[in-house]
Amino acid sequence: AMGFSITEEAIEDNLYDSLSSRYTKALARAMAYTKQVKGADILNNAFAGTTFGDGQVLCSTAHPLVNGGVNSNRPAVGSDLNETSLEAAVIQIAGWTDERGLLIASKPKKLVIPPALQFVATRLLETEGRVGTADNDLNALNNNGSVPQGYAVNHYLTDTDAWFLCTDVPN
């Protein structure tokens, strides 16, 4: 637990008000920082480390299902954020099934990225034309509204090339 104390001498010299205000702001800033770091921790450890109720890390290719199968919420081989990998993720999410193997028709909502990927995300999600080609092709990700809420930059993600799609699946 963080805190601060004011000396009796500071109180006697009437420095309490100026010191208290400065220290209180610093303490609030430290608390806000800690909350952000702890909040990002689940994504920073999504591929290794903390396991959950099914014995798997958050992003795994082998989440066990009741019917004996497994469900994957990540590609078999990690991939950088680009048009192909994002389209593949959108398609994979659309094919997710429930515990009984029934299609749940899930959709991506928002892309979460570290600051290093913000320009890539802008090109992928906000341009009219297809990225990296001189052809006059439409940007299918943008045109189809594949990621309707766009992207959010999380400054507390520690892996500069990790990216995550939030979906409409409730649990």
Task: Report residues per predicted region.
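Flexible, active-site-adjacent loop/turn segments at secondary-structure boundaries
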Residues: 9, 50, 56, 102
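Helix N-cap / beta->alpha transition motif
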Residues: 7, 44, 113-116
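Sequence/fold signature of self-assembling virion shell proteins
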Residues: 59-98, 105-110, 116-171
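General N-terminal targeting signals
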Residues: 21-23, 28, 44, 123, ...
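Short, glycine/acidic-rich hinge or "gate" loops at secondary-structure transitions
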Residues: 36-55
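Flexible, glycine/threonine- and acidic-rich loop/arm segments that mediate assembly and lattice contacts
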Residues: 1-40
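Residues in flexible loops and secondary-structure boundaries
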Residues: 12-14, 19, 42, 66, ...
